[in-house]
Amino acid sequence: MCIRDSIMSYATSPTQRDVMLLGALTAIGASMERYVRCPYAGKLQSPCLQSFIVAPSASGKGILSFIRLLVEPIHDEIRQKVVEEVKAYKKEKAAYDTMGKERCKVEAPQMPKNKMFLISGNNTGTGILQNIMDANGTGLICETEADTISAAIGSEYGHWSDTLRKAFDHDRLSYNRRTDQEYREVKKS
């Protein structure tokens, strides 16, 4: 049985099959990162597929939750590495903090990036940017309720619809915060 048939076997109606196919293509495209490229507009581009499924209540959109299962192993592996890196960082930081005057001779340990593959749709504009940047421009927002996305985008600290448009075109993403003089960017999303 091919992967398409395996994915489609969860669907029980034509609507659910459409939702599963669109969701699977989007998730698989996101998981390809920069391993697959094609020429577009004079540049080599990797897949950046975006799906937003709109249909009446109880019409079968909920089956999209199964799509998340396709990419959870990727997310879980990344998160496990982050846990291990944070553990190592805390150990190094504790040793660094006890060095006393010797600290000036050694570079302070750096907190590891909070990498993830599955990015929460319930997020701020800067949060989305940080998640994408920490993952080197790759990630997937997979929410089963449109309200989660629309509420976050429309909130006071949301407004990340421009980030989605920039990511689609693989444009540079950046932000600057005066408070800590923090500037971050990813040259290609």
Feature locations, PLM:
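Phosphate-handling catalytic cores of nucleic-acid transaction enzymes
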Residues: 4-189
